[in-house]
Amino acid sequence: MATQPTKDKIISSSWELLEELPLTDFSMRKLASRLGMTVSSLYYHFSSKEALFAELIDKASLEIIFPANEKTWQDRLFVYGKNIYSVLEAYPNLAQLMMDYPPESENYLRLFDKLLMIVDDLKLSDDHKFYTINLFLNFIYTSKIDRDRLVEQPEKPVSTVKTPLVQLAPFLYKYWRTESLTSLGSSESFEFGLQLIISGIEKMLKIN
């Protein structure tokens, strides 16, 4: 009798499948086929696809290093943002998973909690602190998703409108002619975005 795959093997095979397929095409049936097991046996380990995804997010979240050596909230947010992005780069479709599924697993909840801890002493309302961290995470996720799309489709999209772009959208055309569009997924673009968010928080603190 063949040995049934372990939970760790199921998780590693899930990442392999996500490397090959978009998230929307992932299914428990395809995963079971890859592992050489029945779907019912797979459901013995994970009650649903959502439960499996929660486990993937949880294990990946554990690898995100908290910037304990940074002294200011600005530096902590900046470095933490880079650390989050680094882990997103290590796992296929993780950014989309974390965007699509709310923080319910232990380590994902801890990640959110540590981010809230960084801004806890700021002179903002609790609602605004929560909005800030939600925006911060969404920026990180969408930056990685945009980067993945640029890797998959490195060529600039072809406009379908008949009017020349230089006439239709002259300001956009200026950037279209340069590398601005393809540099959106660069580390420079990402770090600028982090700094922009942090500067915006500083501005709000002065207003308050």
Over which residues does each language-model region extend?
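Hydrophobic alpha-helical connector segments
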Residues: 66-110, 114, 136
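C-terminal peripheral helix-coil segments that are non-catalytic and often amphipathic
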Residues: 153-208
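Short hydrophobic/aromatic patch on the recognition helix
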Residues: 36-46
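Short, basic, alpha-helical segments at the C-terminal edge of helix-turn-helix-like DNA-binding modules
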Residues: 58-63, 71
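Basic, helix-initiating cap at the start of DNA-binding domains
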Residues: 1-21, 25-30, 34, 47-54, ...
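Hydrophobic alpha-helical bundle segments that form small-molecule/ligand-binding pockets
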Residues: 111-161, 201-204
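Short hydrophobic clusters on alpha-helical segments that form packing/core surfaces
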Residues: 10-18, 56, 60, 84, ...
